[in-house]
């Protein structure tokens, strides 16, 4: 799969702009990118209010931690039972368009229902027994000639509706005694040794003449000259 670069590269200022404003809907995002100054001020005001509230919440949490630390009795732990819980699912660009890299996806993440929790035995796991596919509409934002272009795209999400602790097939554990392993190694070594028999080929008959052993030089010359 070839990756193309459609549209202009996303400028760094856009990332800074998105990270510096509180965007809760597509309308907020569209007004921000189109340069509505009044709405930008309102978004900045919402951001400051959110920060002020978060600071107050941090102070209350700190006071709560100090009060809990003074107590000597700890509450009993409760098991996280197997059930559906709300989780955050990231919408990556691969789900929208795998052939292009110059675009943004909004919203970048959504909430899904997924099975989670622990069971009473390690041989069982929390798994979904009923699943539902839910299509949602997101925005694909491209920058062409320094102007944002908004396109619609559909992403299919998977929600878990029911969960159950199901048995997981465990891998069989093989136990070997020292004697058995040594015998198997010996058999393996013997099986690896191969004996090869090399046959010596003899020269065929009739190609070389046999010379008779004689002490008579005359007869020897006649034999060689024949």
From Swiss-Prot:
MF terms in GO: growth factor activity; platelet-derived growth factor receptor binding
One cellular-component annotation, GO: extracellular space
One of the protein's GO biological processes: positive regulation of cell migration
Keyword annotations: Growth factor, Oncogene
Protein name (Swiss-Prot/TrEMBL): PDGF-related-transforming protein sis
Gene designation per UniProt: V-SIS
Keyword field contains Lyase: no
UniProt-listed PROSITE patterns: PDGF_1, PDGF_2
Residue stretches of biased makeup (Basic residues): 201-215
Family: Belongs to the PDGF/VEGF growth factor family.
Pfam families, A to Z: PDGF, PDGF_N
Superkingdom of the organism of origin: Viruses
UniProt xrefs under InterPro entries: Cystine-knot_cytokine (IPR029034), PD_growth_factor_CS (IPR023581), PDGF/VEGF_dom (IPR000072), PDGF_N (IPR006782)
Region (Disordered): 201-226
Species annotation: Woolly monkey sarcoma virus
């Amino acid at each position: 799969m070839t990756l193309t670069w459609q549209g202009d590269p996303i400028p760094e200022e856009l990332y800074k702009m998105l990270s510096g404003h509180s965007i809760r809907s597509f309308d907020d995002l569209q007004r921000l990118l189109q340069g509505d100054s009044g709405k930008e001020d309102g978004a900045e005001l919402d951001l400051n209010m959110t920060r002020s509230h978060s600071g107050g919440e941090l102070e209350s949490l700190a006071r709560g931690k100090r009060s809990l630390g003074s107590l000597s009795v700890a509450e009993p732990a409760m098991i996280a039972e197997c059930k559906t819980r709300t989780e955050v699912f990231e919408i990556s660009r691969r789900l929208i368009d795998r052939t292009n890299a110059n675009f943004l996806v909004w919203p970048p993440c959504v909430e899904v229902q997924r099975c989670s929790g622990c069971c009473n035995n390690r041989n069982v796991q929390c798994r979904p027994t009923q699943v539902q596919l839910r299509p949602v509409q997101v925005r694909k934002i491209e920058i062409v000639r320094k102007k944002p272009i908004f396109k619609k795209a559909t992403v299919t999400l998977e929600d878990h509706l029911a969960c159950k602790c199901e048995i997981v097939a465990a891998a069989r554990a093989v136990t070997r005694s020292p004697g058995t392993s040594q015998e198997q190694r010996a058999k393996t070594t013997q099986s690896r040794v191969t004996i090869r028999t090399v046959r010596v080929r003899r020269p065929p008959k009739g190609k070389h003449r046999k010379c008779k052993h004689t002490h008579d030089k005359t007869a020897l010359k006649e034999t060689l000259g024949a």
